Amino acid sequence: MSSSFGQVFRISTWGESHGTGVGVVIDGCPSLVPVTEEDIQRELDRRRPGQSDIVTPRREEDRAEILSGVLDGKTLGTPIAISVRNKDHRSSAYDEMARTYRPSHADYTYDAKYGIRAWAGGGRASARETIGRVAAGAVARAVLKQAFPDMEVVAWVDQVHHVKASVDWGAVTASAIESNIVRTADPSAAEAMIAAIKEARDSGNSLGGVVKCVVRGCPPGLGDPVFDKLDATLAHAMMSIPATKAFAVGSGFEAADMTGLEHNDPFYMQGCRVRTTTNHSGGIQGGISNGEDILMRIGFKPTATLMIDQQTVNRDGEDARLKGRGRHDACVLPRAVPIVEAMAWLCLCDHYLRQRCQRAL
């Protein structure tokens, strides 16, 4: 199983949904970076379950404990281990799923690959695996903010099912996004999104949608062609998040409908800085950041576990019917926002440290 991400700033997540706990080991973090448990906890609180009435009611404090690699609020340059205990797991709700496969979940494919799986709560396929990513993302953020104080990563829910928000990439703020439980910066769309999620939940169904993410203040020069282009590794990072099905940077698929003259971003000088008049490239050209805002869209499928009777099969190849039990998100989008941000920070931090190894910034 590949549970690691990054080359220089490298993370390895561990743990299962209903095991003793989950966490992450970070290797390659520079020394003397200010990091506290409070910094990590702030991000974990944004992704934890039970935070509102439109997410899973599972009650977990998700308290982060730094086990190694940090002393007196500063990183030591040695591996950083962060642990979070699982407390509110009810494995009995998954007894039937030990033999019967949930449609479109990872139950069957894990069995096909490993011949065994941690069936309670989905094991490693559970979104609780992302706790380690979010914790590590907080550390990556600290590394980058030390080098580039103005850099920021802001993600928000742009669409839930058929409800779309109207949000300006350039003006969106973290405070506006956190002002509502669905995490969008469009108040009118937020109300409609919340209503749609509740309606799906009450009927036992689920909804998907789109998260948008903008990176501001990224320096030019990050990215490692040809196989580790910045947009390629961002795609890798985002598509590794549970339930993701699509990724686009800049104009994305809309580029197919444009001419070269329409899509090209003309250059101009702003003092000593090279700028572009448009940003169809989404801040990345030739796989390398150009200093403009990096614009991303990530598509999420509806949650696979439904409280509706569905056709399936069991481990013995017999036809079966299955109705989900347990506690699940009817829509993962509100809690996916901090996960998307964390993966962006991790990707950018790794590329920054790679670049620092090659050339002084």
From Swiss-Prot:
Belongs to the chorismate synthase family. Pathway: Metabolic intermediate biosynthesis; chorismate biosynthesis; chorismate from D-erythrose 4-phosphate and phosphoenolpyruvate: step 7/7. Its EC number is 4.2.3.5. GO terms for cellular component: cytosol. One of its GO terms (biological process) is chorismate biosynthetic process. Homotetramer. Its cofactor is FMNH2. Keywords: Amino-acid biosynthesis, Aromatic amino acid biosynthesis, FAD, Flavoprotein, FMN, Lyase, NADP. NADP(+) binds at residue 47. Coiled coil: none annotated. GO terms for molecular function: chorismate synthase activity; FMN binding. The lineage of its organism: Bacteria, Pseudomonadati, Verrucomicrobiota, Verrucomicrobiia, Verrucomicrobiales. It comes from Akkermansia muciniphila (strain ATCC BAA-835 / DSM 22959 / JCM 33894 / BCRC 81048 / CCUG 64013 / CIP 107961 / Muc). InterPro entries: Chorismate_synth, Chorismate_synth_AroC_sf, Chorismate_synthase_CS. This reaction introduces a second double bond into the aromatic ring system. This is Chorismate synthase. Reduced FMN (FMNH(2)). It catalyses: 5-O-(1-carboxyvinyl)-3-phosphoshikimate = chorismate + phosphate.
